[in-house]
Amino acid sequence: MAFKIASSPHVTRNLHTSTVMQRVILCLLPGLVVQCAFFGWGTLVQVLLAILVALSCEAAVMKLRNRNIKASLSDNSAMLTAILIGVAIPPLAPWWMIVMGTAFAIVIVKHLYGGLGHNLFNPAMAAYVLLLVSFPVQMTTWIAPSTVALHSPSLVESLQLIFNVGAHVNMEQFRLGIDGMTMATPLDTLKTDLSMGLTTTESLTKAIFDGSTGVGWFWVNLAYLAGGLVLLKLKAIRWHISTGVLLGLFVASSIGFLLSPDTQASPLMHLFSGATMLAAFFIATDPVTAATSPRGRIIFGALIGVLVYIIRTKGGYPDAFAFAVLLANLCAPFIDYYVRPRTYGHSTS
């Protein structure tokens, strides 16, 4: 075997922040496209509105801090935060909610603590929790996927509903069901049915489910999984956190399902419903708010996965990734303190 010997210096090229953010955004696109295909133009409108607000807030804060506005906007961190918020909230949520959430994420969560690299919590998830706690009805009102809905809002109708101007139908009609079914996510529907005494098998016979997963949500999660795998291939993220999240959720949900299959969702449904793949590859992997060591990252991810299962099954919210990520952010310094790599030349860290 022939080896090519190159002269020194052997310099490796580090990825700039803007390059990493660009790769993450590009890998988000498959999931965004599939989500728009199933849930309409509203998702795209929310994303574009969030980007506009995020860039405006970023520029305003940089101006107040006498920092370089162009450099801050070009690192793409504000745009990524905006996209994550835009895909997380319901497609037809009122415009002022995405404005409020995005402004809170950029101004308070990110810049109040010093800007990029200094925030204690994931900005997108902090904004999501703020909106969910403040406006639970609007944040849990989803339209039915296009494959089962008798009427999906067009681009014009989506704009009218989001901005509440001149719409021939209102959000209440979509919520009550133009298509004759409740507008709730599969996880929310299953949780409600179980609380009413139905079994998992009985609940899964509803039109919003497709076998063992929710209609549309399986393909949305599959698209985000594909994007996440590309992200790993590009080395924009490391595998530890994503693996920890999925493994923690899979093990916890498998134990629950084996112990009580009539009252628990299957591991497949937990993995391919809600924001599982989006959170595992694009949210939990935020390097600023996560643990730093390889073992610490696995523990950090597994903690998120277990917390998601606990909150989904025992808590008041059907999808719990935002709460799980924020709680894990709180634990990250603790994990880093006790899970440190061994110092070279010493038997202990």
Swiss-Prot record:
The modification FMN phosphoryl threonine is found at residue 185. Its main location: membrane. It is a multi-pass membrane protein. One of its GO terms (biological process) is transmembrane transport. Keywords: Cell inner membrane, Cell membrane, Electron transport, Flavoprotein, FMN, Membrane, Phosphoprotein, Translocase, Transmembrane, Transmembrane helix, Transport. Its EC number is 7.-.-.-. The chain crosses the membrane at residues 20-42, 77-99, 124-144, 212-232, 239-259, 265-285, 291-311, 315-335. It is found in: Cell inner membrane. The keyword Protein biosynthesis does not apply. GO terms for cellular component: plasma membrane. It comes from the Bacteria. The keyword Transferase does not apply. Its cofactor is FMN. Pfam families: NQR2_RnfD_RnfE. It is an enzyme of class 7 (translocase). Part of a membrane-bound complex that couples electron transfer with translocation of ions across the membrane. Belongs to the NqrB/RnfD family. The complex is composed of six subunits: RnfA, RnfB, RnfC, RnfD, RnfE and RnfG. This is Ion-translocating oxidoreductase complex subunit D.
